[in-house]
């Protein structure tokens, strides 16, 4: 990546999308790091649709382990757990724990 951005550069980059709604008053208590994690989850949700990961109620779900989030965001285990919790408290995601070392299902 260069220091300066040119008009021709826009098509050469892949971007994560973060909904503008996350920057409104309702979500002011959600940290910027949690919003970034949410952007990663949204990006993966498109892959879940492509893979047909849809439950009986028609809801798209995904698997995104704490370890995977750590690798993407370069945060420790405790920090990632806190970020997932923030998203749950803000009603942005629902995690269904499966137990026995299996990753949670994320809606």
Task: Describe the residue ranges of each PLM region.
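Short recognition helix of helix-turn-helix/winged-helix DNA-binding domains
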Residues: 1-66
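Winged helix-turn-helix DNA-binding recognition segment
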Residues: 27, 44-107
């Amino acid at each position: 990546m260069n220091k300066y951005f040119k008009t021709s550069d826009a098509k050469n980059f892949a971007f994560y999308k973060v909904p503008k709604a996350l920057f409104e008053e309702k979500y002011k208590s959600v940290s910027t790091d949690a919003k970034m994690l949410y952007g990663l989850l949204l990006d993966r949700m498109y892959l879940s649709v492509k893979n047909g990961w849809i439950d009986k109620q028609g809801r798209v779900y995904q698997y995104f382990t704490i370890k995977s989030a750590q690798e993407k965001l370069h945060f420790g285990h405790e920090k990632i757990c806190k970020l997932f919790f923030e998203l749950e408290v803000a009603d942005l995601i629902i995690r269904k724990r499966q137990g026995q070392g299996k990753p949670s299902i994320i809606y």
